Amino acid sequence: YMHIVAMEGSGIKTVADLKGKRVSTGAPGSGTEVKGLRVLEAYGITPKDLKSQDRLGVTESAGALKDRKIDAFIWDGGLPTAAVLDIAVTPGVKINIIPHGDAAPKMVAKYGPLYFTAVIPKGTYLGMESDVSVAVATNLLVAHERMEEPLAYQITKLFLEHTADLVAVHKGAKEITLKSAVLGSSVPFHPGALRYYKEKGIKIPAS
């Protein structure tokens, strides 16, 4: 989930408000930076439009925001992200998660069917009083096209029917569901995976 995190009182309520602000766009060369710059681009914003562009990882970005060294930062990660949780519970600090879900169609038009719109539910972070629409890209489990169909079927089945084991390792895995598993793929589904989804009555999006 793409997060755009701003400090309450910074004057940042929309992506357009990032112009002229100090923004961390993610570590150099990271997925966060690539996706974050594409979100900004969808709104007609380039790094030159920012007062300053810091290129920090999420922990460093969170620290810089708390220290008022930046006005906002971009982060792409699961829900909830520990560093964002930490800021949200810091005494005297209130954050805003900036909506930008309407960037997804523009990103798809330019870069292909890698992105879609999803929601960070209210209450994910302290102070979030409503759902926030954001642009997201999925993580993919990729197999060679020559993998045997029964094996691909069993892998898909085991993965999706044992998500509780994954959640025990990483809370972000709670977002993995039958419906979410078929969203945002830019490559064809393996026949073995398709057989499992068909058994479960899950339709594959046209994209």
Residue ranges and their predicted role:
Residues 1-67, 164, 179, 183, ...:
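Bilobed "Venus flytrap"/periplasmic-binding protein-like clamshell domains
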Residues 3-5, 24-25, 72-76, 96:
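Structural recognition of the beta-strand scaffold that forms the well-ordered cores
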Residues 10-12, 25, 29-33, 78-81, ...:
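Solvent-exposed loop/turn segments at secondary-structure junctions
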Residues 37-44, 66, 72-95, 102-117:
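A ligand-binding cleft/hinge motif common to bilobed small-molecule-binding domains
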Residues 41-45, 66-70, 89, 157-164, ...:
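Sec-exported extracytoplasmic/periplasmic mature domains
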Residues 59-60, 80-83, 125-128:
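Glycine-rich, charged/polar anion/phosphate-binding loops
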Residues 89, 94-154, 196, 204:
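C-terminal lobe and pocket-closing loops
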Residues 130-207:
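Segments of small-molecule ligand-sensing domains
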